[in-house]
């Protein structure tokens, strides 16, 4: 029973302590092609998913939007210049990107002030895979909750 001051009025309640923020989560939907990874993603609650990173979706967006990709829509909130440096470092350091000849992108990508990445073509699944990996790594750096889909078919 709450205590009452001497005048009989109810004591003021102390402000509620806010719940601690949820811990960021990383979820991986993995399996061979056609195993239902994308289907499972559509059945999960959005609050469970966080940001969803899918190389197939990245490839489609690059093709549909002439090489542009909104990084804020993918959960990235760092300064554009820092994100661009991180993307270029990832491409430079990735043996997979080197094998694919993606070093041609170095110095040729831009990110505008609202976080839209512009990448020169051609736009294919290999480019999308490297970008998806770089985006996942950036989300990890930023401490964001996210889910990604992968076939886990390569050590790279």
Regions found by a protein language model. Give the residues of each.
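Hydrophobic positions on the alpha1 helix immediately C-terminal to the Walker A/P-loop
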Residues: 40
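Conserved glycine(s) of the Walker
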Residues: 36
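N-terminal pre-Walker A segment at the start of P-loop NTPase domains
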Residues: 2-15
């Amino acid at each position: 029973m709450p205590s009452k001051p001497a005048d009989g009025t109810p004591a003021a309640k102390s402000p509620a302590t806010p719940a601690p923020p949820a811990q960021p989560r990383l979820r991986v939907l993995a399996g061979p092609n056609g195993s239902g990874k994308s289907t499972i993603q559509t059945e999960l609650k959005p609050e469970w998913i966080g940001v969803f990173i899918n190389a197939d979706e990245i490839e489609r967006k690059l093709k549909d939007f002439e090489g542009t990709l909104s990084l804020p829509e993918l959960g990235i909130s760092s300064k554009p210049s820092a994100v661009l440096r991180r993307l270029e470092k990832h491409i430079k350091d990735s043996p997979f990107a080197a094998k694919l000849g993606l070093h041609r992108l170095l110095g040729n990508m831009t990110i505008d002030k609202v976080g839209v990445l512009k990448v020169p073509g051609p736009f294919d699944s290999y480019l999308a895979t490297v970008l998806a990996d770089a985006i996942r790594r950036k989300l990890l750096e930023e401490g964001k909750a996210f889910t990604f889909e992968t076939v886990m078919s390569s050590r790279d």
